[in-house]
Curated annotation (Swiss-Prot):
Pfam families in UniProt: AAA_16 (PF13191), Cdc6_C (PF09079), Cdc6_lid (PF22703)
GO biological process per UniProt: DNA replication
Function text: Involved in regulation of DNA replication.
Superkingdom classification of source: Archaea
Effect of disrupting the coding gene: Not essential for normal growth.
Organism: Halobacterium salinarum (strain ATCC 700922 / JCM 11081 / NRC-1)
Binding residues for ATP: V61, G62, K63, T64, A65, Y211, R223
UniProt-recorded name of the protein: ORC1-type DNA replication protein 8
Length: 397
């Protein structure tokens, strides 16, 4: 049978090294952040109660990778030292479990993963789920670090962030100790927590800045050595991938995606060398993929608000104020038989879309006569947004 598949081109030695799931054994260009993390967690290996830690930074700057590296290092160090209690770390992504109740169930089931206990299911009361979580923590008779990735996705219910740090004080655990490690893309996340939760957390903060071009070159050199066959890259490919990613968001993920797609372009053209022209072709592919993936993660009304800005941009009417955009948004919602949200909610969506990189936000101040307000314009390609929303599962536009 004749098939449409090509013979394998030996440009990749190990393509998985350039995939999202790959976790490097050694973390590059994050020594300062690792030192801050070690200082924040030093009490654990010294035998004291751990501090809560919150980690902030944009997507792709190493927050989750460094956190996992530090959890592994901490568990190893605790095992290696005499007189130090065992350390257990458990991670849950709050994007997939966006309420305290769902996150608590997921934590229980992660902790039960290596036991004979049955997993929890929904339907239990909140107090029963919390008691099950405290029981699992107490059963470890050591230090348990609860890692909540994308913690800014937790809804307005602060229950878990209030209960975990107070577990020992409230008598929910006795022979163990627990701390929360929160990872967030949103630097203002803490401000949205209730005052009692802010007072309870008393956390240490670690901020991850975007990578610069030189740091991204180091990271790409390391990945390329493991992922690619010798001599397949022309000299300017890695610097170009690094420069483009640094200029955009400073994301290692973006730089690695550009490198991988550049190699794919060369393979599809049946060439044995990757050039800077291949990088230019890869840029649009990566951007389209990023936009498509990010739009899938938006709520339905988040997509409607983004589409409203996109349509306004196509009409050459941006930057636009939120109150002027609202009518466009309401028409889109009505088109899909959905009741529009309040103007305040739309304003919140606009702020979120700005933080995610879809929009550019302008602060206008015209004094007493004109007032102060924000205007918004699209910061990504309008056609890509339309195509991505058209493909999204929960909004076909």
């Amino acid at each position: 049978m004749k098939t449409p598949f090509r013979d394998r081109v030996e440009l990749f030695a190990n393509k998985d090294v350039l995939k999202d799931h790959y976790e490097p054994e050694e973390i590059r260009e994050r020594d300062e952040e690792i030192d801050q993390y070690a200082n924040a967690l030093q009490d654990v290996v010294d035998g004291w109660e751990p501090d809560n830690v919150f980690v902030y930074g944009k997507t792709g700057v190493g927050k989750t990778a460094v956190t996992r590296y530090m959890m592994d290092a901490l568990e190893y160090e605790a095992d290696d030292r005499d007189g130090v209690d065992s350390v257990t770390s458990v991670e849950v992504n709050c994007h997939h479990h966006p309420s305290s109740y769902q996150a608590a169930i997921a934590l229980v089931n992660e902790l039960r993963g290596d036991t004979d206990s049955d997993p929890l299911t929904t339907g239990l009361s909140t107090s029963d789920v919390l008691n099950a979580l405290f029981d699992e923590i107490e059963a470890r008779e050591g230090t348990v670090l609860i890692v909540l990735d994308e913690i800014d996705n937790l809804d307005d219910d602060d229950m878990l962030l209030y209960q975990l740090p107070r577990a020992k004080t409230n008598g929910n655990i006795e022979d163990s100790q627990v701390a929360v490690v929160g990872i967030s893309n949103d630097y203002t996340f803490r401000n949205d927590l209730s005052p009692k939760v802010q007072d309870t957390l008393c956390e240490r903060e670690i901020k991850f800045p975007p990578y610069d071009a030189n740091e991204l070159v180091t990271i790409l050199d390391d990945r390329a050595e493991r992922a690619l066959s010798s001599g397949v890259l022309t000299g300017g490919v890695i610097p170009q991938c690094a420069a483009l990613a640094a200029r955009d968001r400073g994301s290692a993920r973006q730089a690695i995606d550009l490198l991988r797609e550049s190699v794919n372009v060369a393979i599809e053209d049946e060439r044995e060398t990757v050039t800077e022209d291949d990088v230019e072709t890869a840029v649009r592919r990566v951007e389209r993929g990023r936009i498509k993936d990010s739009i899938k993660d938006l709520t339905t009304h988040g997509q409607y608000v983004l589409l409203a800005v996109t349509q306004t941009a196509i009409a050459d009417d941006t930057p636009v104020r939120a109150k002027e955009l609202y009518e466009v948004y309401a028409d889109i919602a009505a088109e899909y038989a959905s009741d529009p949200l309040s103007q305040r909610s739309v304003h919140d969506h606009l702020n979120d879309l700005s933080m995610l990189g879809f929009l550019r936000q302008h602060d206008r101040n015209y004094g007493r006569g004109g007032g102060q307000f924000f205007e918004y314009e699209l910061d990504v390609d309008a056609t890509m947004v339309q195509e991505a929303i058209a493909d999204a599962d929960d909004a076909t536009v």
